Amino acid sequence: MGNGKAFYLGGHYDEVKNCTFHDNGELGFQISRLIATEVSVSEWPSNNLVLNCESYNNNDPSKNNADGFACKLTAGYNNVFSGCSSHHNLDDGWDCYTKLATGAIGPVQVENCVAYRNGYQLNDDASETDWGNGAGCNGFKMGGENIHVAHYLKDCISWGNKRSGVDSNYNPGFKMRNVISYNNEGP
């Protein structure tokens, strides 16, 4: 297990394709600002595409911030995840969290993606171990702190996660279409 994030994207108009992020000491891949003086959503990373990537087996010492993919806290507009897979992470498969201190982020689109077995570790022999009580363990977490953000989840599947397959996390603006969520263990 490494230390920190595998990949932290703070730019604009980037494409990340056919990459794998695994066994990191925090989350696998995150889109968020890199410079603290960027305080407006218009300055935050925007217009990025993450295509056909996989993130798995990410774990952090605090047991609450090891998402597979994250586009949260300080991310701008038009960030898209397409054809990606997130599984066996300590925390959420996808985390699109927003908090009051920084304000609403730009809407995130997640399409044709799968999230499964988050909350469980994938061992070298292909068996699984329960990570314990991680913070999320959801397939797709699409908001936070009752802030309206028009995140859009479409044509995705979520199954076998330790908690919810899809969690709006108090986001009143979240939308989804053609999403299948089954055999998740619940809240």
Per-region residue spans from a language model:
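Short "repeat-start/strand-capping" segments in structured domains, especially the N-termini
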Residues: H12-E15, L34-A36, S46, Y77-N78, ...
